[in-house]
Amino acid sequence: KIHVRTIYFNGKIITNSQSRHNSMNKPLENLRVIELGQLLAGPFAGCMLGYFGAEVIKIEPPGGDPIRNWREVKDGTSLWWRSLGRNKKCISLDLKTEEGRDLVKQLMKTADVVVENFRPGVLEKWGLDPVSLQADNPNLIYARISGYGQTGPYSEKAGFASACEAISGFRFVNGYPGEAPVRPNLSIGDTISGLHAVIGILMALRAKDQAVHEGKSGGQVVDVALYESMFNLLEAVIPEYDGAGVVRQPSGTTVTGIVPTNTYKCADDKFVVIGGNGDSIFARLMKAVG
């Protein structure tokens, strides 16, 4: 359940949107996360960290994150936002102004983790990049999510899940033979990259603990690319091509090389999904079918 209350930061009234936590201890309690992302990838990572007890402070532009107004709206707020915005404290700041950036820099000094999904180079221009912030907070974990990573020939291009899913090859194998590549009706590229960011953050926190124990600074940069996150889902597609020269083709609702696993139409015009993905399972399936 979402509730709204007023809190204060640096003498200014701000709005906090968060879900009610139960009394059970959570593994990320006492961890402060500053979220600079908008829309999906960065906010999904922040949401996941919040699930497990982290204090997530989301920095929104004036007017709020665009997701607040997308799709179905109830009581003035998008229902989609209620999914991505829960477990967060939300502050509206204009990062294009010096005052807004100064306020963020103050917050960063108290943070354990930063999550951002701006186009590479933007935060460097604003002085909110890892080098600048880790100078004042050497143990800061800085997670960056972008279309194509922070380096390389495509790094400065704006990256959207729609394009990155295609570049990875996912949409090709997800389609139907002889037809255009298919996009699933969910933003998988964004959520998968958000999950990769969370995994990177947790590993970076582990490395930081070890470094601090040894008397060293534990700051880390986690660089997540949307297309690489999707590439990581392709299972045997790449080694099959490298080792056998086989290009995996689109197969519609089936999975190449595994039978029976498909969606089958029933006599009542409804559908059933059957996955007999193993010899013993197949034997039991055939016995059930008769």
Describe these PLM feature segments.
Residues 167, 171-290:
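Acidic, glycine-rich segments within the central catalytic cores of soluble metabolic enzymes
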Residues 11, 20-214:
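N-terminal helix-loop segment corresponding to the beta1-alpha1 unit
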